[in-house]
């Protein structure tokens, strides 16, 4: 059987050794111990006085078509995947289905110009992601990756075709809507 004073001393001893180990690992600004820590702290203070960001920021990099298309490809893929996930779960759980949702939107009788904007916002990322995915598959096959001019031409082609095809889909949709009402 352990007596109470021993248990208290053991707990206090353990607690003080733990607090001692945590206390020595934390370096505050006033007690930098090594020359490297002093240099690092002075460097951060100097950067702060010049209103510079601590880490590299996107404003440091020059905008280039290659990384912008790559970023938009990733973003459009994530947004579409999230939309399918949330929409699929939502329509599985909610008491109405997708067709009822579409009929509800159609019951608002919005003008074609308003629906065209929303249709373009939906169509462009889908078309862009598809065409840019085909472009990236070509890069995976090492087609055109050693020619920077070819990379830029294919990027402009994907961007232009995506915009044109999305406009064609939206225009065709508005034409079909006006033909049905006439």
From Swiss-Prot:
Family matches, as InterPro entries: SQR/QFR_C/D, Succ_DH_cyt_bsu_CS, Succ_DH_cytb556, SuccDH_FuR_B_TM-su
Pfam families hit by this protein: Sdh_cyt
Mitochondrial matrix side: 140-147
GO MF terms, alphabetically ordered: electron transfer activity; heme binding; metal ion binding
Transmembrane among keywords: yes
Residues spanning the membrane: 65-94, 115-139, 148-169
Pathway in which this enzyme or protein is active: Carbohydrate metabolism; tricarboxylic acid cycle
Domain of life of the organism encoding this protein: Eukaryota
Example of a GO cellular component annotation carried by this entry: mitochondrion
Function according to Swiss-Prot or TrEMBL: Membrane-anchoring subunit of succinate dehydrogenase (SDH) that is involved in complex II of the mitochondrial electron transport chain and is responsible for transferring electrons from succinate to ubiquinone (coenzyme Q). Mediates resistance to enteropathogenic E.coli infection.
Protein name as annotated: Succinate dehydrogenase cytochrome b560 subunit, mitochondrial
The species this protein was found in: Caenorhabditis elegans
Phylogenetic classification of the source organism: Eukaryota, Metazoa, Ecdysozoa, Nematoda, Chromadorea
């Amino acid at each position: 059987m352990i007596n109470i004073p021993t248990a208290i001393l053991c707990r206090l001893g353990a607690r003080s050794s733990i607090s001692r180990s945590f206390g020595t690992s934390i370096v505050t600004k006033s007690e930098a111990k090594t020359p490297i820590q002093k240099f690092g702290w002075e460097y951060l203070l100097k950067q702060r006085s010049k209103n510079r960001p601590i880490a590299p920021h996107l404003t440091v990099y020059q905008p280039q078509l290659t990384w912008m298309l790559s970023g938009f490809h990733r973003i459009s893929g994530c947004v579409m995947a999230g939309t399918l996930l949330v929409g699929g779960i939502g329509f599985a759980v909610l008491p109405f289905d997708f067709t009822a949702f579409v009929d509800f939107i159609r019951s608002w009788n919005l003008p074609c110009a308003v629906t065209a904007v929303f249709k373009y916002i939906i169509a462009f990322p889908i078309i862009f992601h598809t065409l840019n995915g085909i472009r990236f598959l070509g890069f995976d096959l090492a087609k055109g990756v050693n020619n920077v001019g070819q990379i830029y031409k294919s990027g402009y082609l994907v961007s232009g075709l995506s915009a044109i095809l999305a406009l064609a889909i939206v225009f065709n949709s508005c034409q079909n809507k006006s033909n049905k009402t006439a």
